[in-house]
Structure formats: C-alpha cells, structure tokens
Amino acid sequence: MANQTPIPVIVNGAAGKMGRETIKAVVQAADMTLMGAVDTNPEYQGKDAGEVAGLNEPTEVPITDQLEPILAYVAGERHLQPGVMVDFTHPDAVYDNVRSAIAYGIRPVVGTTGLSSKQIEQLADFAEKASTGCLIIPNFSIGMVLLQQAAIAASQYFDHVEIIELHHNQKADAPSGTAIQTAQMLAEMGKTFNQPAVKETEKLPGARGSLAGEGIRIHSVRLPGLIAHQEVIFGAPGQIYTLRHDTSDRTAYMPGVLLAIRKVLQLKSLVYGLEKIL
C-alpha cells in the first residue's frame, strides 16, 4: 500500500454508534483517508467528525446532512483511488443512498439492514450495469461468520433448528439481517426442518416466531443493555446443540469493516455477505 494513494472513505450515519467506530477505524488505518461524514441528526451538523467519534485529534471533516455533494466531491478527486461509502443509516434511507453512491461511481459498503429481497435484486442489477462494486454485509463480525459455518455443518445431522436474535432496543428492523441470512444459509442445504410432531396452535399471534423458509423460525428480542447476539439451537431426541455469538463492543466489527472497504474496490458487482470476501 506504500506506493498507492489512500482509499477515500465517506461514512454515512457518522454520528451513530457504528458510524463513530467506523470513523475511528478509518482514521487509524494507514491506507485510508476520511473524506466525508454524513448524518441527518441536526445536533451534529458542522461538528468535526473526529470530535463526535471521540478522537483526540480533529479530522477537519465536518459532519453534514447532505450526501450528494459529498459523493460528487469525492468522485471528482481523480488523483485518488475510487471512493467508498460506508452506510450505517436507516432501513428507510439505505436503498436511495446506495443508488446515489453507485451513480457517482462510489463503492458502497452497506451495514444497514432492512433491505428487501427485491431491493437487493434491483441494487445488484444497478451495480452490475455500472460495473461498480457493492458490498451488503448484515454482520461484519468474523466470529458470526464462523457461527454460520458451524451451523451449516450441524444442519447435516439435525432436523430441528430455531434461531434467536437479540439486539439493543434502538434497532429498527426485526428480525435482524444476520438472522435472516443464517436461516437462508440453512434453507439452502436442501432439506425441510422442524417437521411438526403435533398440530400447533398459537394462542397469541407470533408466539412461535417468524417463518423464514424451510420450516426455520426466527425469534427476535429487543432490550436495552444488549448489543448484538444470536443463538442457533439444534434439537434431536436426547440432546440440544447450541451455537451462540455475543458482541460485547462494536470494535468487534471493525476488522470486517476495514476488510470490506479494501475488497469492494476489487469488485464489479454486488456481493452479499462477509463470508464471500474472507
């Protein structure tokens, strides 16, 4: 990297918890430079991104609520590598954010969950036509990728499985993108799980969770005090096999975020999932 210019990075959702951690990680990465910080919260407009993130030194990058001028600015810096936008915003905003970034030739790295399957298909088509890399990653934790791989291995030997995901009460969407992705991975094994032993009746709608395909149920918990946690519970006569991953601090995601920023520059289309770039 010594002979290359640094990767210009825009952090969208800069004042959020993941945005702040990303700013710190990008500033500390020798091969990256923070070029823009965007957040719609009026409390942080004009404030230095480094100050908001808790860095000791200012970044001289003010937070703005206008994404497109930042995209245009970074796209116009031709002496730099192609820009990357890291998006930790809101399910209602992320689709338009990604389309705007791709339109400017900026590579999106998306950690915001809540995109529908149809929206992901549309973004994949848009990215492919633009020959622009895009990464959508429900969970940047390498430990979570290992849990998912272990779950795939276990699914060959167990016919009953349910997923419980637990997050902080500021998370807007449920179930989590990671839980949905885990269920999809298991569904791709080509078997139907959880054949009922009896005819089930829900006394309260949703008591048995949401069906994610092939009989796999997902249960969501939202409480203050939690960050991000997931259990995949397999059952068979006489035994229970539980896989669990706990995030105790958001710094756990930063190796995955930095890896995604570097890898997205090598892509010409949309890729879904951290496991695809490890």
Swiss-Prot record:
Key word Ribosomal protein present: no
Show the active-site residues: H167 (proton donor/acceptor), K171 (proton donor)
**Keyword set includes NAD:** yes
Residues annotated to bind NAD(+): G13, A14, A15, G16, K17, M18, G111, T112, T113
Q: Which GO terms describe its biological process?
A: diaminopimelate biosynthetic process; lysine biosynthetic process via diaminopimelate
Task: Report the superkingdom from the record.
Answer: Bacteria
Q: What family does the entry list?
A: Belongs to the DapB family.
Query: What protein am I looking at?
Result: 4-hydroxy-tetrahydrodipicolinate reductase
> What organism does the record attribute this protein to?
Mastigocladus laminosus
Q: Identify the gene encoding this protein.
A: dapB
